[in-house]
Each structure stands twice: as structure tokens, then as C-alpha cells.
Amino acid sequence: MHTPAVLFRSVNMEKSKKSVAGSRRDTRRRFEQWVQNPACGANLVSAVHNVKMGAVARRENPLAPKEGQSVFALARGNNFESSLVRDGAKVLLASMHKVGLLKKTEKSFLDFRTSANGGPLADLDEAIKKSEKLLVSLADTSTFRGVVSSLTLRIPKGVMLPEATLIIDVVCVKDNLEEGTGAIISVGEVKTYPDRGGYTSKSDLAKARAQMGLYVHALP
């Protein structure tokens, strides 16, 4: 059992056309790791320099265990995320409509997941190309309004980490009603926690919000 949490923060895309470039692969989990404990020097080395935490730990203590994250925990999270975007993101779109993040008419869906994660795209390079094309179109005249799964971006060197690739779980695109033109996107982070009767701790929510803040910082 698990308690899902899908949280969002927004950024105006009306004038955002900045191109991003970089070379490192899939660093989403490094952002999660960094936010979990930003004050820890060993964690900082691991996340920023892309060194496995186990290697950092064994540098300090050669007897440190070699086991990584639980395969069961990873499978649980992957299964939950897949259920959200199944059948054209039926469950996710219904949830976004229910809470008012999207209007009923904003119901389009794009799936930028790679085949390794159960998606239709061949690799990260294809995901990056499609994601960048979408963002540029949103700054122009695109009429896409709805949900994007696994928007994938190259992060320029020096923005937050060395050159890296960022995969955002969920992006919602809606009309910019305040300005009457263009679009606003909201970045969402999908989390799974052990079942606590629907309760999610404030610290877990705070970490997720901090992580989404990094995503918003990376987008403009």
C-alpha cells in the first residue's frame, strides 16, 4: 500500500524560449538525493559530482555495505507512476480536473517516457528533442493544454549542477488567464510513501516542494 502525493509549482512560459544544452544522463534522482540532505558533505559530493553514495561511504569506511536502494521500493514507485499515465493519463487528468488545476477542456496528453521506463520513446535524446520542441511551441502559438509525462531537459553547466539531464514527472499546461495569452506550466512531482492512512508528513511535503522549486529554477 502507498499514499500518493502529486504536488505542483508553476512558471509563466509566455516569453520563455531559452535553449538548454548539456550532456549528462538522467539526473532526476540526483536532485532528489540532494534535496533530502543538502547539509551533508558526503551527500553533496555524491549528488553534484555524480558519484554513487556507496562509493563515497566506502571511501570513508571500507566496511560500509554495498547495497543500494530497495528494488521493491523502486518497483512500487514505478508501478504507481505507470498507473497515473495509463490509458492516456485518464487517472491523472481526472485528478487535475477535480482539484481545478486544469479545466475540463484541457485534456491533451503527451508521453515523453523512454522505453526503459515503459514509454513510447526510444531514448533520452528523443525525449529531450520532443520536450524542447514543446517548450518552444508553448512560447509561440501552441494550443496544447493538458498533461505531459516525463518532460526531459538538458540543464546548462553552472545552473545547478554540472551539465545534466532533468526528467520532470508531470507537467500541466494551462491557459494564462491573467494575461489572456500564452500558457502557464505547473511542474509536478510524484511520490510514493508507506501507507499511513492517507497521512503524509510535513517534512516529506517540504522536501518535495523544495525539489519542485529546483525544477522551476531550471526551466526559464
Across the structure, where does each feature detected by a protein language model lie?
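Nuclease-adjacent, charged terminal/linker segments that flank catalytic cores
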Residues: 1-88
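Generic serine detector
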Residues: 10, 16-19, 23, 46, ...
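Residue-identity detector for glycine
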Residues: 22, 41, 54, 68, ...
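Alpha-helical protein-protein interaction elements
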Residues: 23-26, 101, 207
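Alpha-helix capping and helix-coil boundary motifs
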Residues: 40-43, 123, 201
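Low-complexity, highly charged intrinsically disordered N-terminal segments
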Residues: 48-137
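Active-site metal-binding core of divalent-cation-utilizing nuclease and nuclease-like domains
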Residues: 104-182
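Mg2+/Mn2+-dependent nuclease catalytic core
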Residues: 153-220
